[in-house]
Curated annotation (Swiss-Prot):
Heterohexamer; disulfide linked. Contains 2 sets of 3 non-identical chains (alpha, beta and gamma). The 2 heterotrimers are in head to head conformation with the N-termini in a small central domain. GO terms for cellular component: extracellular region. Cleaved by the protease thrombin to yield monomers which, together with fibrinogen beta (FGB) and fibrinogen gamma (FGG), polymerize to form an insoluble fibrin matrix. Fibrin has a major function in hemostasis as one of the primary components of blood clots. In addition, functions during the early stages of wound repair to stabilize the lesion and guide cell migration during re-epithelialization. Was originally thought to be essential for platelet aggregation, based on in vitro studies using anticoagulated blood. Its main location: secreted. The keyword Disulfide bond applies. The keyword Disulfide bond applies. This is Fibrinogen alpha chain. It is found in: Secreted. It comes from Camelus dromedarius. It comes from the Eukaryota. A long coiled coil structure formed by 3 polypeptide chains connects the central nodule to the C-terminal domains (distal nodules). The long C-terminal ends of the alpha chains fold back, contributing a fourth strand to the coiled coil structure. GO terms for biological process: adaptive immune response; blood coagulation; innate immune response. Keywords: Adaptive immunity, Blood coagulation, Coiled coil, Disulfide bond, Hemostasis, Immunity, Innate immunity, Secreted. Conversion of fibrinogen to fibrin is triggered by thrombin, which cleaves fibrinopeptides A and B from alpha and beta chains, and thus exposes the N-terminal polymerization sites responsible for the formation of the soft clot. The soft clot is converted into the hard clot by factor XIIIA which catalyzes the epsilon-(gamma-glutamyl)lysine cross-linking between gamma chains (stronger) and between alpha chains (weaker) of different monomers. Forms F13A-mediated cross-links between a glutamine and the epsilon-amino group of a lysine residue, forming fibronectin-fibrinogen heteropolymers.
Length: 18
């Protein structure tokens, strides 16, 4: 859930824009 998360977290929890 980090604003600078990786693709995995980005797609899973919608973290950062990567």
């Amino acid at each position: 859930t980090d604003p600078d998360a990786d693709e995995g977290e980005f797609l899973a929890e919608g973290g950062g824009v990567r």
